[in-house]
Swiss-Prot record:
A motif (Switch 1) lies at residues 32-50. Its main location: nucleus. Primate-specific retrogene derived from isoform 2 of RAB6A transcript. Keywords: Cytoplasm, Cytoskeleton, GTP-binding, Hydrolase, Magnesium, Metal-binding, Nucleotide-binding, Nucleus, Phosphoprotein. GO terms for biological process: intra-Golgi vesicle-mediated transport; intracellular protein transport; mitotic cell cycle; protein localization to Golgi membrane; regulation of centrosome duplication; response to xenobiotic stimulus; retrograde transport, endosome to Golgi; retrograde vesicle-mediated transport, Golgi to endoplasmic reticulum. GTP binds at residues 23-28, 39-40, 42, 71, 126-127, 129, 157-158. Belongs to the small GTPase superfamily. Rab family. It comes from Homo sapiens. It is found in: Nucleus; Cytoplasm; Cytoplasm, Cytoskeleton, Microtubule organizing center, Centrosome. One of its GO terms (molecular function) is GTPase activity. This is Ras-related protein Rab-6C. InterPro entries: P-loop_NTPase (IPR027417), Rab (IPR050227), Small_GTP-bd (IPR005225), Small_GTPase (IPR001806). Its cofactor is Mg(2+). Highest levels are found in fetal and adult brain, prostate, testis and spinal cord. Undetectable expression in adrenal gland, skeletal muscle, bone marrow, fetal, and adult liver, heart, salivary gland, and trachea. Detected in the HEK293, HEK293T, LNCaP, MCF-7, T-47D and EVSA-T cell lines (at protein level).
Length: 254
């Protein structure tokens, strides 16, 4: 049996790299998706971290390797090697910080320089809970995404708003997963981002520019695969073997 629990079918693994300036809450997005939690005391990473998580789609199960990169200028030289073999890039900015939005152009250019023009890229405006401090409008984000031919979504990691939808959208665009776009298990009708409800977390969908339709997941999948998490500092080896819990199931990370 494969790691994903599908008889005879090996678990397909995809590398997603998160990019953006320091303090745009890239780590918070990953933590919200991986653990469904938010840590107000979380410190900025130094170097590169990664977590793994399985996703249960209509077409099967996939493994996501979520690479969290540091946004500090002095650590930029570490990042290109992790972009090169990625299946997708998530470029994050803070809607309350216009400079972080402006810098996303450079991040997207870096991705295409290292990975090529066919890489999947999603532009994410985070921290919509701070609407009173907003410096970048939804329309500006949509225009930039359209001009750069990338997908766009706004999120709120603190409350979980649109975080699942972000990963569903990325998963639907991954190689071999295109058919999952037509096999949704949930209603993915659009949400207007201009007036998010502070007291609720929408699971219905997202309002975004995108050349593709969305993919969905069951809200409570049978997570039989043991997810692995590894924290990595500056001295990161190019290849690791991670063993999952007591099953000693090898998962190769590159």
């Amino acid at each position: 049996m494969s790691a994903g629990g599908d008889f005879g079918n090996p678990l397909r693994k995809f590398k997603l790299v998160f990019l953006g300036e320091q303090s745009v809450a890239k780590t918070s997005l990953i933590t919200r998706f991986r653990y469904d939690s938010f840590d107000n005391t979380y410190q900025a990473i130094i170097g590169i971290d990664f977590l793994s998580k399985t996703m249960y789609l209509e077409d099967g199960t996939i493994g996501l390797r979520l690479w969290d990169t540091a946004g500090q200028e002095r650590l930029r030289s570490l990042i290109p090697r992790y972009i090169r073999d990625s299946a997708a890039a998530v470029v994050v900015y803070d809607i309350t910080n216009v400079n972080s939005f402006q810098q996303t152009t450079k991040w997207i250019d870096d991705v295409r320089t290292e990975r090529g023009s066919d890489v999947i890229i999603t532009l994410v405006g985070n921290r919509t809970d701070l609407a009173d401090k907003r410096q970048v409008s939804v329309e500006e984000g949509e225009r930039k995404a359209k001009g750069l031919n990338v997908t766009f979504i706004e999120t709120r990691a603190k409350a979980g708003y649109n975080v699942k939808q972000l990963f569903r959208r990325v998963a639907a665009a991954l190689p071999g997963m295109e058919s999952t776009q037509d096999g949704s298990r949930e209603d993915m009708s659009d949400i207007k981002l201009e007036k998010p409800q502070e007291q609720t977390v929408s699971e219905g969908g997202c309002s975004c520019y995108s050349p593709m339709s969305s993919s969905t997941l069951p809200q409570k999948p049978p997570y039989s695969f043991i997810d692995c998490s590894v924290n990595i500092g500056l001295n990161l080896f190019p290849s690791l073997i991670t063993f999952c819990n007591s099953s000693l199931l090898p998962v190769s990370w590159r």
